[in-house]
Amino acid sequence: MTDGLKIDSRPLPAFYCCYLLRSKNRKAFYIGSTPNPARRLGQHNGSSKGGAKRTSMQGKRPWEMTCIVTGFPSRFAALQFEWAWQNTHATRHIERDVREARKDELEKGRKNASPVKRSRPPMSLEARLKNLHHLLGVGSFSRWPLHVRFFAPDVFSQWEKHISKMNTSLRKSITIRLTPAELPKLAPDVSSEMRTHFIPEVIRAIPVAYEDIKPYVEKSMSTLRDGKTRDCGVCKKDVNVDRSLVLICPNETCCSVSHMSCLSQRFLAEEANKEAFIPIEGTCPSCHSPIKWSDMIKELSLRMRGEDELKTLFKTKRKKKQVDTTEDDTDEYPDIDDLNADLDEDLDETWMENVNEEDDKPRS
């Protein structure tokens, strides 16, 4: 590889999301971001250290994760979206008329607020969902590979009710889905602490350690190491993997390779958006299957920059010997609590000092 391609940085994160928590009494909400929703929910509910101070206030636990927004290309991108979602009265990502309405609410709230009260206007759940819908459609975030996943059916129903009234719809590449978080059927004598610390399996099962693209990475590395001469699927010229940024079709049965610049131009041409610089999706020049640009870029960054991450991903993790067995059980994937744990820092408690309780009265 040439010196120009030696990039001393980490690959794109395996996973990063923004989330909306709701407290047990359903009068308080929290917006945050994390690379590991299951671990973060445990922090908020006190099963591990690192949760924001505000979320540990008396009477607020247990917290439930009602929905997440996924697809952020970096931690800083998620923090940017998180701040905008928390501060719709101040962010420039929201249209001026919407922002001014939020400011009016803020000024009304300040008149009766004590000096120690927080500076954000009170918001209902409906308002938070409206703000989320606004953010998903603004130019700043409209080309990010974002998706929304709901865990609380009643929150999803309120979202559906809201978008049914909207004149504009989100772009088709944004998927909105409901995967209900089933609460356990615990016996009456189960301690309240156990109930508080419960993390739904649907949240635990979210892939946060590159395990979802492991087969794709294996296929790409095998394709590039087979010694065969390959031509770019777009320009048809020879592909030099040591000097070029090369993208591989993620389709299991397709071995198409392309220069990143060539495939980018092809995808943008298919989209016919002259103002766009980064594609969202397109079709493989060989198998013609639809491909998400973000999937290929994540695989490329992991393959080129993730030496340590790849070692962890492909290393067989040993467990302790079980009783009456002669062999060790193994775990195919790395411990998600170890991978990228340094990215999941304690939340900034000053943010929560400026968050209000829910206002049950919907605001126009």
Swiss-Prot record:
<feature type="domain" description="GIY-YIG">
    <location>
        <begin position="14"/>
        <end position="95"/>
    </location>
</feature>
<dbReference type="GO" id="GO:0008270">
    <property type="term" value="F:zinc ion binding"/>
</dbReference>
<keyword id="KW-0862">Zinc</keyword>
<feature type="region of interest" description="Disordered">
    <location>
        <begin position="34"/>
        <end position="59"/>
    </location>
</feature>
<keyword id="KW-0540">Nuclease</keyword>
<dbReference type="GO" id="GO:0000724">
    <property type="term" value="P:double-strand break repair via homologous recombination"/>
</dbReference>
<keyword id="KW-0234">DNA repair</keyword>
<dbReference type="InterPro" id="IPR050381">
    <property type="entry name" value="SLX1_endonuclease"/>
</dbReference>
<dbReference type="InterPro" id="IPR013083">
    <property type="entry name" value="Znf_RING/FYVE/PHD"/>
</dbReference>
<keyword id="KW-0233">DNA recombination</keyword>
<keyword id="KW-0539">Nucleus</keyword>
<comment type="subunit">
    <text>Forms a heterodimer with slx4.</text>
</comment>
<keyword id="KW-0255">Endonuclease</keyword>
<dbReference type="GO" id="GO:0008821">
    <property type="term" value="F:crossover junction DNA endonuclease activity"/>
</dbReference>
<feature type="region of interest" description="Disordered">
    <location>
        <begin position="318"/>
        <end position="364"/>
    </location>
</feature>
<dbReference type="GO" id="GO:0033557">
    <property type="term" value="C:Slx1-Slx4 complex"/>
</dbReference>
<dbReference type="InterPro" id="IPR000305">
    <property type="entry name" value="GIY-YIG_endonuc"/>
</dbReference>
<dbReference type="Pfam" id="PF01541">
    <property type="entry name" value="GIY-YIG"/>
</dbReference>
<feature type="compositionally biased region" description="Basic and acidic residues">
    <location>
        <begin position="101"/>
        <end position="110"/>
    </location>
</feature>
<feature type="region of interest" description="Disordered">
    <location>
        <begin position="101"/>
        <end position="121"/>
    </location>
</feature>
<feature type="compositionally biased region" description="Acidic residues">
    <location>
        <begin position="325"/>
        <end position="364"/>
    </location>
</feature>
<keyword id="KW-0227">DNA damage</keyword>
<dbReference type="GO" id="GO:0017108">
    <property type="term" value="F:5'-flap endonuclease activity"/>
</dbReference>
<comment type="function">
    <text>Catalytic subunit of the slx1-slx4 structure-specific endonuclease that resolves DNA secondary structures generated during DNA repair and recombination. Has endonuclease activity towards branched DNA substrates, introducing single-strand cuts in duplex DNA close to junctions with ss-DNA.</text>
</comment>
<keyword id="KW-0378">Hydrolase</keyword>
<comment type="similarity">
    <text>Belongs to the SLX1 family.</text>
</comment>
<dbReference type="InterPro" id="IPR048749">
    <property type="entry name" value="SLX1_C"/>
</dbReference>
<keyword id="KW-0863">Zinc-finger</keyword>
<dbReference type="Pfam" id="PF21202">
    <property type="entry name" value="SLX1_C"/>
</dbReference>
<dbReference type="InterPro" id="IPR027520">
    <property type="entry name" value="Slx1"/>
</dbReference>
<keyword id="KW-0479">Metal-binding</keyword>
<protein>
    <recommendedName>
        <fullName>Structure-specific endonuclease subunit slx1</fullName>
        <ecNumber>3.1.-.-</ecNumber>
    </recommendedName>
</protein>
<feature type="zinc finger region" description="SLX1-type">
    <location>
        <begin position="232"/>
        <end position="287"/>
    </location>
</feature>
<dbReference type="InterPro" id="IPR035901">
    <property type="entry name" value="GIY-YIG_endonuc_sf"/>
</dbReference>
